[in-house]
Amino acid sequence: MEAFLASLVSVAFHGAALGMILYVISVGLSVTMGLMGFANLAHGVFAMAGGYVLTTAISRFGVPFPLALVLAFAFVAAASVVLERLLYSRLYAASDLEQVLFTIGLIFIAVAVARFIYGTLQQPVVLPDYLKGQFALLGRDFPAYRVFIIVFSGVMVGLLWFGVERTRWGAMVRATVDNRAMAQSVGIDTKRLFTLTFALGSGLAGLGGGLGAEIIAIQPSYPFENLVYFLVVVSVGGLGSLRGPFVAALLIGIADTACKYWLPQYGAFPIYVATIAILLWRPAGLFGRRA
């Protein structure tokens, strides 16, 4: 019984760490899809880019880990502004099929570029000494870096919630998600809002990709291998919501860890079955708005 409880705590802890990473990466996709109505399947490319920025900055240039996290966010956010202005903005009025084909094409290009520059091997993550080893908590030892992931991501969740719920920018985002035409009629510059929100969501994906590089391997196939997880978080949580993807990411992180620990022969199949069941029950997601 004691061994089972220990494994239960371990699964919950590691699942929570994975869930927090999935949330930091996916929440931007949820908000931008709810705000812009753009089917951006290339969101994982931004997470992969953040992972490469972090690992390259640390291993090749000796950048301290905290600064490397900042660089991952800033570089990806800046690159996303260029892509949004040059490419994405031209397809806002396009059909869903055209948007899907465009973003899948971006994935193929990003994968080819990553493979050309870095090869096919997983990028190693060099952690600072203070994030190595174990952290004692409630009489148990947990990996210090996983504890850091949970705490740091929790702070990011709080800051994001404050930004969306308690600032003028957040009020404009919520108004535009609810009714874009009405938001434009009262003077909200939706084009500029789209760019800023897209940059924030992409930057968070880059930050999550770098932060979670020790959990979700950074390699050229990253956008394809993890696309389903990001879409499941968004679809189960609901578009345009902060709370929904948070709950969905934690559930999926814990469920994925539990399946790999207790039912490795089934892989992620139980998660897909549960996702289908939830969407049949609530097509708009757990916290999404019904049409």
Regions found by a protein language model. Name each.
Residues 62-107, 113, 247-252, 282-283:
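Alpha-helical transmembrane segments within multi-pass membrane transporters and channels
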Residues 18, 141-218, 242-248:
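Helix-loop-helix "hairpin" substructures at the membrane interface of multi-pass membrane proteins
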Residues 61, 90-91, 95-166, 193, ...:
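Transmembrane helix-bundle core of multi-pass membrane transporters
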Residues 62-74, 195-275, 280:
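Transmembrane alpha-helical segments in multi-pass inner-membrane proteins
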Residues 51-55, 73-79, 106-114, 152-161, ...:
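Hydrophobic core segments of alpha-helical transmembrane domains in multi-pass membrane transport
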Residues 7, 86, 117, 178-185, ...:
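Cytosolic-side transmembrane-helix boundaries in multi-pass membrane proteins
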Residues 7-59, 82, 86-98, 234-242:
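Single transmembrane alpha-helix segments in multi-pass membrane proteins
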Residues 1-10, 136-138:
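Short, strongly hydrophobic alpha-helical membrane anchors
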